[in-house]
């Protein structure tokens, strides 16, 4: 599986909106599935079904 890069666009309650850097795709995902310390503007790598801070 290829690595994808996302930026946290906004956080509303317990959910985050992630914008993929290489396209206009946007994800709506629960904060519980993201690494501790994620905030608006954080850059995340998604690989092997796991998000990590870049």
Please provide the spans of the model-predicted regions:
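Glycine-centered tight beta-turn/hairpin loop motif at sheet-sheet or coil-to-beta transitions
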Residues: 1, 22-24
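Structural detector for short beta-strands of small beta-barrel domains
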Residues: 1-12
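Short aromatic-glycine-enriched beta-strand elements
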Residues: 14-18
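Beta-strand/loop nucleic-acid-binding surfaces
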Residues: 24-36
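Short, Lys/Arg- and Gly-enriched loop/turn segments at beta-strand edges
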Residues: 49-54
